[in-house]
Regions:
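Ser/Thr-rich, Pro/Gly/Ala-heavy low-complexity intrinsically disordered linkers and tails
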Residues: 1-37
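Substrate-binding cleft and catalytic face of glycoside hydrolase catalytic domains
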Residues: 74, 84-160, 164-176
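N-terminal carbohydrate-binding accessory modules
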Residues: 22-95, 318, 324, 329-337
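Acidic active-site catalytic centers that drive phospho-/nucleotidyl reactions
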Residues: 54, 136, 260
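Extracellular glycoside hydrolase catalytic/binding regions
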Residues: 43-45, 69, 76, 94, ...
Length: 338
């Protein structure tokens, strides 16, 4: 099996075989219960310094997939409990991200009941499967929808605030907005609503410029406990310069979570390319610092190389290499890494 690659600058390179270490394993142990779940093992998460830790004080590196924008998720991969249990058992997934679209037609602003129901299905499944779950307000203009976000996260915290599985993500990818004057006040308002109902579950805060400018957030972090900051990368586009920003933020004590990444260009890989060499550098960096992640995206779309699944993938799991496409085998291998 081979893939076409590209250098970090985006130039195409000839197809090359995938390193076996980047393939992962097709071994299938099913979706049944197999001993302690991730949440049973690690319990309540907390942010200590620049690290996420479990209830035993050990560094916790979450790994799992992000859903597609749920308003465009036709197959229901992320909402299937058997598939989630299967990923937990076979890919060692410890987290899933529920990317609830906000602005597009049919998303939260125009169909809130459907959007909330989709998120709650994923959260309920995560609780049943014993994995962590990120409730993502998947919006580029959340500062314009602050009242709706405050209400939504207050409802989520009321319903799920006593569950250690839950992580809140109130702003997916802000545009190039002012941190101090716009984003920070937005986060403070949503945090206050969550903390009124849930005093301790982790909240991850979106950062300026498509959640890349973590260095700007590090200049004036939000006050509070158990707060992480979002970093997003797409390996063909974002290289050592973005890791430099992240290193600078971490040096100032800013704890990070990569809630979205791909071994593709930043457009999600519409050209079908993957950049595995560049992606490996990112994973070496995340592993060194214990930074957790969710990979974009658990979907079976056609051309985009950020789609993990092939068009013929079954909804309930059992995804051998035959059912993976784009960066899918690489994502699987990185989840299966010890």
């Amino acid at each position: 099996m081979g893939v076409a690659g590209c250098d970090p600058g985006g130039a195409e390179s000839p197809p090359a075989p995938i390193d076996p270490l980047d393939m992962g394993s097709d071994e299938d142990v099913g979706s049944g219960d197999m001993g302690p779940t991730p949440v049973e093992l690690h319990g309540q998460l907390a942010v200590v310094g620049a690290e996420l830790r479990d209830e035993h004080g050990e560094r916790m590196q979450l790994k799992g997939p992000s859903s597609m924008w749920l308003n465009w998720e036709n197959e229901g991969f992320a909402q299937n409990l058997e598939a989630l249990r299967w990923m937990r058992n076979n890919w060692r997934a410890t987290v899933i991200r529920a990317a609830m679209g906000v602005e597009p037609d049919g998303a939260y602003l125009t169909n809130p009941d459907k959007a909330r129901s989709q998120v709650e299905q994923i959260v309920d499944n995560a609780i049943a499967a014993g994995v962590y779950v990120i409730i993502d307000w998947h919006d580029h203009n959340a500062h314009q929808h602050k009242d709706q976000a405050v209400q939504f996260f207050s409802e989520m915290a009321t319903k799920y605030g006593d569950k250690p599985n839950v992580i809140y993500e109130p702003f997916n990818e802000p545009l190039d907005l002012d941190w101090q004057g716009t984003l920070k006040p937005y986060h403070e308002a949503v945090i206050a609503a969550i903390r009124a109902k849930d005093p301790d579950n982790v909240i991850v805060l979106g950062t300026p410029n498509w959640s890349q400018d973590v260095d700007r957030a590090a200049e004036s972090p939000v006050a509070g406990t158990n707060l992480l900051y979002t970093l997003h990368f797409y390996a063909c586009t974002h290289t050592d310069w973005l890791r430099g920003k992240a290193d600078g933020a971490r040096a100032k004590g800013l704890p990070l979570l990569v809630t979205e990444w791909g071994a593709t260009h930043a457009d999600g890989g519409t050209d079908g390319q993957v950049c595995l060499d560049a992606a490996r550098l990112w994973h070496e960096w995340m592993n060194t610092h214990g930074i957790g992640w969710t990979a974009w995206k658990l979907d079976n779309c056609g051309q985009d190389s950020s789609c993990i699944l092939a068009p013929n993938a079954p909804v309930t799991g059992g995804w051998t290499s035959t059912y993976l496409k784009g960066h899918g085998v690489f994502v699987r291998a990185r989840m299966q890494d010890e």
